[in-house]
């Protein structure tokens, strides 16, 4: 059994299992996120994955048009866009992903509580290029199986961890792209020091993404010093999209 599957997380996962597969005819090739992160980093810029979300359990709430937001992030230099598709707690939808995929030319992350191959099928069909897999809501066997299934489409998985045990599982499963979430999904608290220590423990062969609570270019610089290769930023950019250039160039 996964170590953390209770309370609101359990409800969200159960809902994810019930959501039907959405079939579409994919209209674009899969874009590879890891080489793009390396290219942006190599150019002396910060690879920012800009997130589109409507709300979250932490109390965040913001209503922006998905297309105009995504285009502004692309124009501002974001390496990719994360689209939350979880529909009960985060106010996301598959429609947002599909619409954004038709309007931008940078990689898209389907950010959801992915627990089934049907969700991966949906991600591919709607135009995602990489998919979030959260270690804490999956068994190690499930994680390995879903990682292999995601890659069978030519996509990549952003494997999210929060502590050393999560990281060990992610590494054993063969993750190439690991996201360190400073927010504990269960308590919703931000633990930045713990996240920074975890970033330092990830092998250099793995591409590392710092997630949650990033509010300034100074924080990005500090996370970069700790080994982060890319930065997933949601609330700060949703509140003030103009920050994207500062974050990319800072």
Curated annotation (Swiss-Prot):
Q: What is its EC number?
A: 4.1.1.48
Instruction: State the coiled-coil residue ranges.
Output: none
Q: Which domain of life is it from?
A: Archaea
Q: Which pathway does it serve?
A: Amino-acid biosynthesis; L-tryptophan biosynthesis; L-tryptophan from chorismate: step 4/5
Record field: catalytic activity: 1-(2-carboxyphenylamino)-1-deoxy-D-ribulose 5-phosphate + H(+) = (1S,2R)-1-C-(indol-3-yl)glycerol 3-phosphate + CO2 + H2O
The keyword Lipid metabolism is annotated on this UniProt entry: no
The protein, known as: Indole-3-glycerol phosphate synthase
The primary gene name is trpC
